[in-house]
Amino acid sequence: MENTRDSAAISETKYIKASNRVTIYDFIKLAKPGIIISNSIAAFGGFWIAFASAEKTLTGLAFLMTMVTAMLGTAFVMASGTVYNNYFDRHMDAKMARTRSRASVTGKMPPAMILTYGSVLGIAGLAMLYSLNPLTAFLGLAAFIFYAIIYTVWVKRTSVWSTFVGSFPGAAPPLMGYCAVTGDFSMTAVLLYTIMFLWQPPHFWAIGIRRKEEYRAAGVPLLPVVKGNHVTKIKMMQYIAVLVPVTLLFPFSLGTGHISPFYFLAALVLGGIWIKKSIKGFKTDDDVKWAKDMFVYSLIYFCLLFFIMMIDSFMMFLIR
């Protein structure tokens, strides 16, 4: 009987040790893959648009190497920022249902390991970007500092406008992708940055409305928590209403003189649907359900908009 109990105790100990072992999944989850994927889509969009509109285009192996380096470098720098974000937010995340299982919260990954992981990602990413040109590396470093330090450590904890402030570094990926090809700015690069900047607040405030009570419990002064859902809905609609006409400027920024009816129609339809959905928010009885719909559509809008911008710029590349 005693041997049986000892065997059971040993088995339980082995199970606990195995369950506490850090896995690849823990590292991936800590980097917030959802954010990295959306950032990578934007970065690739910027890269492709720059490639299609550049006077001297990359070809063959040079194109492939530049693209891979730019995408990996951008993803690594952004992942470094999200890992540092998880490190600084671990005590806050412990109070939220959707984040309390993260390895940074449970103690599965000790703080030193998290910082090492984030630092390695950041250094590797910046080195890749610097190998392309100093400007892209500088943009990556600036975005990291702004997001991981200014936004995460300071503004997120103290200001109702943290989402607005966080949009400055959050809009960097398409700019970085563009500059990876050109090595300098242009009206197109600034417009891509502006589009992603305006897209972010409605997207993240939709999450804020859905998870309002969790943010309240964690002490995060997010707009829905402090000002309420109605004010947040007004702000979301204002951003979307500005975003839609700004997206229509994209063909003009390329400076080719070619204006695509396809792009205008697609951008108007996508934007019109989002505006219509935002208006529905003032009539709904279920804010959480509405916010979920807004969140999902914001991702669809984002992906399709960048896709049609890439198609439009490539069509101009073919006819020039």
From Swiss-Prot:
The keyword Transport does not apply. GO terms for cellular component: plasma membrane. It comes from the Bacteria. Pathway: Porphyrin-containing compound metabolism; heme O biosynthesis; heme O from protoheme: step 1/1. PROSITE patterns: UBIA. InterPro entries: Protohaem_IX_farnesylTrfase (IPR006369), UbiA_prenyltransferase (IPR000537), UbiA_prenylTrfase_CS (IPR030470), UbiA_sf (IPR044878). It is found in: Cell membrane. It is a multi-pass membrane protein. Its EC number is 2.5.1.141. GO terms for biological process: heme O biosynthetic process. Coiled coil: none annotated. It is an enzyme of class 2 (transferase). It catalyses: heme b + (2E,6E)-farnesyl diphosphate + H2O = Fe(II)-heme o + diphosphate. The chain crosses the membrane at residues 34-54, 58-78, 112-132, 135-155, 160-180, 189-209, 234-254, 255-275, 299-319. The keyword Zinc-finger does not apply. One of its GO terms (molecular function) is protoheme IX farnesyltransferase activity. Converts heme B (protoheme IX) to heme O by substitution of the vinyl group on carbon 2 of heme B porphyrin ring with a hydroxyethyl farnesyl side group. Carbon 2 of the heme B porphyrin ring is defined according to the Fischer nomenclature. Belongs to the UbiA prenyltransferase family. Protoheme IX farnesyltransferase subfamily. Interacts with CtaA. PANTHER family: PROTOHEME IX FARNESYLTRANSFERASE, MITOCHONDRIAL. NCBIfam families: cyoE_ctaB, PRK04375.1-1. This is Protoheme IX farnesyltransferase 1. It comes from Bacillus subtilis (strain 168).
